[in-house]
């Protein structure tokens, strides 16, 4: 890579930075993202309310009109922008991966680096610019996040396809999301890190040279994609359309497709529906050699105003457009919904060929030119396909699904409509966030459905009585705190899944997760269920959910330990096993969880990095993280009741002892194992053993910024502040999934919610 010009800039922000000196330094930047400071909207701006006031039908009419309003500066293929806008929406939502819930279209991140400059997103800068007059017209009533996806829906409808519906409610973010791991490669289209036998990419725009890759590979049919990634190359959304590493091998391509789409939470039927449905429209672009394509938006000259990939081939647009380097139009009706894609896939035999840009693709054997030219109505072309298209026919499972869809057009249309809706909404979280006139009423199996509360909820008097009942069960307070925290902290701010609402900790698979300490969990749940049954049997009309009681149990124990009033807001309900996709929820199980002193690091990720990642998913700030760790430790909320980090002589009482003892200069720490995961604290003078702790504890004394926070709480005047801050952070985590509540101090435009 070329030398970074910022390092030479002798102004604020320039020069050699800390991370240049110490690349392994633990970075807290992902805990400082998307704060009110970076948000230009008013603090009390309520996006949900603004969206509800939107002239939704007027917006859709404007979008429909845009589809055929071809602009000279960026003309529409076939006189219709539908294919371009479908790709824009797909590539916005399609970055989602179920492994950590990150990516997706829920925050409008396609506007920012690196996504706005990925080689797979060439020309989508033009798509968003075409949308600007409409965004400008409707202002803050429609976010970019919603607009990018709604436009894809309208594009489909404008070409005769009936969609499944649409839900708005995605507030925008205002900066690039630095928390997403997109891979470790340093060149576009490289994959040498995510695969053991991957290849380096290249500087600038281009295509992967499959012929060269083929010489170097031993087996592209058996390889494992690094987790949590869901794309086969740096800068691609899914797989290489030319084939694995540019090699036109449809069978191997099918394997890559199954992995990448699977990590986006799609099964085989949904995968086929999305590919076959999406490729029923538009075309790819590879009119000439890719060396004609200039710098991506983030590297383009300032006068280009955020547009990139200037093209010196011919006119640089229209019939001379170069994006992927592939030149394929799949059907004879690229602006109209129909069965053309599947019909052509099976009508012809296919053979490899090259695009004008030198990319590997396929052409129909013994075929007549039946494919329209995008700009010359008097010209016809031979049918062409991508390696990823031929893969659907060559893979036995995909082939069976394709033939079924081909024989049953209505089934295919329904499957595509549902898969497309899932693609656009998978990272939106529960239905309580879905707003707008086109929200479907059908409960979908992937939406983590929680029934609405249809009974009278408990009041303050009930809450006080129930807290006494819970404490009277004899369950140890530390166990009540552990289970409440375990339930609530399953939440992921990335895709808004998990959390205490629904009480899914009592259901498979969470009830058997090792981190949840199943034996302790069963004991606590049994006690809470008895309290629930007694209350519900004796109250006329009123009910209390187990989800509420799990949180209330933690609140009662915390009040006893702190002497403070801990806020509690009832209104949660209980989910069912029927509405809990076991396979999907397995991805929420943590490998390591520093909050509960569970697990340890790997060769690639240190324990403390897992902790910061987990804090980021919980939308915590660095001070909130610090307060929670200190409190959970002295409250003995560790996995398996371990003493790791319980740096106090009064366990079970909320004090600042954790920080006082961690920062005690009279204590010397030494590793207790060869891995450097567990440490023993010794008295410097007597050499007596005092404490045991893990890396997730010692980092608060070793890391300069975390130590600075710990010092605030360790000071003589820090205990009361610590207790208040812990209770506030606890309350926040208990309610992270309460989208039915307006989050105080954040406004509903807050992207982390």
Curated annotation (Swiss-Prot):
It is found in: Cytoplasm. It holds the Pfam family peroxidase. GO terms for biological process: cellular response to hydrogen peroxide; hydrogen peroxide catabolic process. It comes from the Eukaryota. Bifunctional enzyme with both catalase and broad-spectrum peroxidase activity. Formation of the three residue Trp-Tyr-Met cross-link is important for the catalase, but not the peroxidase activity of the enzyme. There is a cross-link at residues 90-238 (Tryptophyl-tyrosyl-methioninium (Trp-Tyr) (with M-264)). It catalyses: H2O2 + AH2 = A + 2 H2O; 2 H2O2 = O2 + 2 H2O. The keyword Endoplasmic reticulum does not apply. The keyword Transmembrane helix does not apply. Inhibited by KCN. Homodimer or homotetramer. Its EC number is 1.11.1.21. InterPro entries: Catalase_peroxidase (IPR000763), Haem_peroxidase (IPR002016), Haem_peroxidase_sf (IPR010255), Peroxidases_AS (IPR019794), Peroxidases_heam-ligand_BS (IPR019793). This is Catalase-peroxidase. GO terms for molecular function: catalase activity; heme binding; metal ion binding. Induction: Induced in late stationary growth phase. There is a cross-link at residues 238-264 (Tryptophyl-tyrosyl-methioninium (Tyr-Met) (with W-90)). Belongs to the peroxidase family. Peroxidase/catalase subfamily. Keywords: Cytoplasm, Heme, Hydrogen peroxide, Iron, Metal-binding, Oxidoreductase, Peroxidase.
């Amino acid at each position: 890579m070329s030398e970074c010009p910022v390092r030479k800039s002798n102004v604020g922000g320039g020069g050699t930075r800390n991370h240049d000196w110490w690349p392994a330094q633990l970075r807290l930047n992902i805990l400082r993202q998307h704060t009110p400071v970076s948000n230009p909207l008013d603090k009390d701006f309520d996006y949900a309310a603004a969206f509800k006031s939107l002239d939704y039908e007027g917006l859709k009419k404007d979008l429909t009109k845009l589809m055929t309003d071809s602009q000279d500066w960026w003309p529409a293929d076939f006189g219709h922008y539908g294919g371009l806008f479908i790709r824009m929406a797909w590539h916005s939502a399609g970055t989602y991966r179920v492994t950590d819930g990150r990516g997706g279209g829920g925050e409008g991140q396609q506007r920012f680096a690196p996504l706005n400059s990925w080689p797979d997103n060439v020309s989508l800068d033009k798509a968003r610019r075409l949308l600007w007059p409409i965004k400008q017209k409707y202002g803050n009533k429609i976010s970019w996040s919603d607009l990018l996806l709604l436009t894809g829906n309208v594009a489909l409808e404008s070409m005769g396809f009936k969609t499944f519906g649409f839900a708005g409610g995605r507030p925008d973010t205002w900066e690039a999301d630095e928390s997403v791991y997109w891979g470790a490669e340093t060149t576009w289209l490289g994959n040498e890190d995510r695969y053991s036998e991957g290849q380096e990419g290249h500087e600038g725009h281009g295509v992967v040279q499959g012929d060269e890759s083929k010489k170097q590979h031993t087996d592209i049919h058996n390889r494992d994609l690094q987790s949590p990634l869901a794309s086969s190359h740096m800068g691609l959304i899914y797989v290489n359309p030319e084939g694995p590493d540019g090699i036109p091998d449809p069978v191997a391509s099918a394997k890559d497709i199954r992995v990448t789409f699977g990590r986006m939470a799609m099964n085989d039927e949904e995968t086929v529906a999305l590919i076959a449905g999406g490729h029923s429209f538009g075309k790819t672009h590879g009119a000439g050699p890719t060396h004609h394509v200039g710098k991506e938006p983030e590297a383009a000259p300032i006068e280009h105003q955020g547009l990139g990939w200037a093209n010196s081939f011919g006119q640089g647009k229209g019939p001379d457009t170069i994006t992927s380097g592939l030149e394929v139009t799949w059907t004879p009706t690229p602006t109209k919904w129909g069965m053309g894609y599947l019909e052509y896939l099976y009508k012809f035999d296919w053979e490899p060929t090259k695009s004008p840009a030198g990319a590997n693709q396929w052409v129909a054997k013994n075929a007549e030119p039946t494919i329209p030219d995008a700009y010359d109505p008097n010209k016809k072309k031979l049918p062409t396909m991508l390696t990823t298209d031929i893969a659907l026919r060559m893979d036995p499972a995909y082939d069976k699904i394709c033939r079924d869809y081909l024989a049953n057009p209505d089934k295919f249309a329904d499957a595509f409509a549902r898969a497309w809706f899932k693609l656009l909404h998978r990272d939106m979280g529960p239905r309580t966030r879905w707003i707008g006139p086109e929200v479907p009423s059908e409960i979908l199996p992937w939406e983590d459905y929680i029934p609405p509360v249809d009974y009278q909820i408990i009041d303050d008097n009930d809450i006080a009585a129930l807290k006494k009942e819970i404490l009277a069960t004899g369950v140890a307070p530390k166990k009540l705190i552990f289970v409440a925290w375990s339930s609530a902290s399953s939440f992921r701010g990335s895709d808004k899944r998990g959390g205490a609402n629904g009480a899914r900790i009592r259901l498979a698979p969470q009830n058997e997760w090792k981190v949840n300490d199943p034996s302790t969990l069963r004991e606590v749940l049994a006690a809470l269920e008895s309290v629930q049954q007694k209350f519900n049997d004796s109250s006329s009309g009123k009910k209390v959910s187990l989800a509420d009681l799990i949180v209330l149990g933690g609140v009662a124990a915390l009040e006893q330990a702190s002497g403070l009033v801990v806020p509690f807001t009832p209104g949660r309900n209980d989910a069912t096993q029927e509405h809990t996709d076991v396979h999907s929820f397995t991805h929420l199980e943590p490998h390591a969880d520093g909050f509960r002193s569970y697990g340890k690091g790997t060769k690639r990720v240190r324990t403390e990095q897992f902790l910061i990642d987990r804090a980021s998913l919980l939308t915590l700030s660095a001070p909130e993280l610090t307060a929670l760790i200190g409190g959970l430790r002295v409250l003995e909320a560790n996995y398996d009741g371990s003493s790791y980090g319980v740096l106090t002589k009064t366990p079970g009482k909320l004090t600042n002892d954790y920080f006082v003892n961690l920062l005690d200069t009279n204590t010397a720490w030494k590793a207790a194992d060869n891995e450097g995961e567990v440490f023993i604290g010794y008295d410097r003078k007597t050499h007596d053993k005092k404490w045991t702790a893990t890396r997730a504890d010692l980092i608060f004394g070793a890391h300069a910024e975390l130590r600075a926070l710990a010092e605030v709480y360790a000071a003589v005047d820090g205990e009361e502040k610590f207790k208040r801050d812990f209770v506030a952070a606890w309350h926040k985590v208990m309610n992270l999934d309460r989208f039915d509540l307006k989050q105080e101090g954040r406004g509903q435009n807050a992207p982390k919610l």
